């Protein structure tokens, strides 16, 4: 759920109704659902902290006992002056306090600076709550071995990681996907036991969209090259998990 970009802040009740509808459908289907406070152009999560507190208070009151509901409280903090200790940590602490009153044990994902790349800033500065995870994002055509080493170092130093967004293209989204580099990333994540979510379940004219633009039904014919790739990776993981 975008905060700006014509999102929640511009039509709170309508957008919240759509979020609730989506969550309810996921619960019926016995799926995990991540409620994503998707900041982007607003850069610093503190700009709309009060609105985030109100939103997550409302939503966690409804779904506080649903263990398949995950709260992601600030997608991709960004901007040179938006750092973990000075900006994201104090924001997260205030929002988590509200969620924990309604949902003591739910998983909460917290974004990290530089569009969820600077996860090393979390080392030694984790939030004082249980079931907190820290977001890391990448795009296979842009972020390679150096980023995997950074992520591995964070894990080795006790940072619980959730890759809540990754794409098969470049960070600029481009027109091509990078299967070989994506293979390296997926193998790395699976070997480390890191959960991941692919961007994105949409039919936008972007390389990372899994659906073709004129899609009306969900079948392989309507999946993009990226969609077919991601479906294959999910199926491979399921086969491994269910052995």
Regions found by a protein language model. Name each.
Residues 32, 49-70, 74-204, 208-240:
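Extracellular glycoside hydrolase catalytic/binding regions
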Residues 2-4, 42, 69, 78:
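Localized chelating/binding microdomains
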Residues 39:
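Short glycine/proline-centered loop/turn elements that form peptide/ligand docking sites
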Residues 1-28:
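Active-site-adjacent substrate/metal-binding segments within catalytic domains
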Residues 243:
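Extracellular carbohydrate-recognition regions
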Residues 45:
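Short acidic-hydrophobic catalytic motif
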